[in-house]
Amino acid sequence: KLIQITQLHKNKSVTTADSTSLAKQNFEFLAETKTILGYTCQKAKTIINSNTIELWYTNELQVKGAPTILGQNIGLVLEMIRNGNFVITATKIEKIKAIQPSLLLQNSTTKSNILDGVTYKDLVWKSRFTTLPIFENEIINFSDASKSNDSILRFANGTIILKKVTFPIVSKSDLLFLDLIEQSNGDAYDRTGSVFLIPQDKKQSFLDGLEKGSQTLPIYENGNGKKYQGIVATSEFAPLIELMRFFTPFGIKQYNYIQLKDKLWHVKVPYRMDITDFKTALSGKTVYVGTFIGNYDKGGHKISMNITVHPSESKLPQPNYCLPLFNTTNVMEMAGQEYATLFNHEKGLEVTFTLDKEYKNAKLRYITTGHGGWENGDEFVPKKNTLRLNGKEVFSFVPWRQDCGAYRLFNPASGNFNDGLSSSDLSRSNWCPGTATQPIDITLGNLQPGTYTLQVTIPQGAPEG
């Protein structure tokens, strides 16, 4: 029997017992030998999950053991080689007092229940990183009955949920990830979703608008006759920082009773995004993190969300400064925030900002998606995005997704057309029902101290539908 014990932390250990895995290990024993630490070793080889594993083991010590579960029963493994390019080699052999697993369990200073193998592996895996639970089975819907509680704040008739979160100090090389799970709780349609944090380092924040109304937020005007609340940075206001933009599928789980030949619907849709770019805005701080799903359904949607911090030895350059410039996702749509129609004017969006020192290797993290109308609307027509810094074009591209049909099994309530396609199959302006939209990193180079104006223009179509 193989007994594994892992000390997760000072006050908790986990144990599993397995009587079959050693017997299932199959090796090809080869004639090659070599000496490691003065002991003659023989070679065994096996293939696991398309990986070739070579073990060099000795029987001269009359003990058995290995760096991993693999080879525990063939002798004392002193070297393990994976695919010829990853090597673990013993550097020292030291005799210690024999320890029986049963005694180790008995003498343990912590209580440790014997777990099944899958649960054991899961707990050991999760112990390697820090998990910050944000939301668990929270409803995002449209209802006058939506109320805040001690931990979750609700705004815009329940379409926004908000929580104050304290983040640990994150080291320079750590990686941060955002995970969100969504299910329909009644709404059958694909909806815009956004996960965001609220900067509070200026005189006014977006939280003021949530609490006092969108009309209290700074107004942006570009000459098209409309007023847009809280979308661009000013000297006294920072807009929302969007951690992830995602799109719900058509009615996942709630509408899985809809039957189609050879379609086995998924019951939940997972979204996962690397948010390491926002490390400096999160590390060691207490901030408001929110999620928005635009909908007018009383049942709405159900979500769970975590943020995880992963230790890493990555040598890649890490951001050391984060400046929010604009966010046109109108998360307060259901509380009067104007829809982002500003791109119907040639001026588009302009934001002016000032840097008090040089910033090297600056980049703009840009998320763009097109919406509105039917077959001729911006959702279904490619539109060129052009970005200019101080009047000079720095980037342009046409955001477009052509792989939406790959996510059909997330979309049970997607409408089917006479041409053999379903609504969720159709290509769209940089998004698909049931996916997150990937940010674009735009290189700005080294920015000297001074004042800059960033402009974004998109040839927005006329209203339709």
Map each language-model feature to its residues.
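Extended soluble regions of mature proteins
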Residues: 1-124
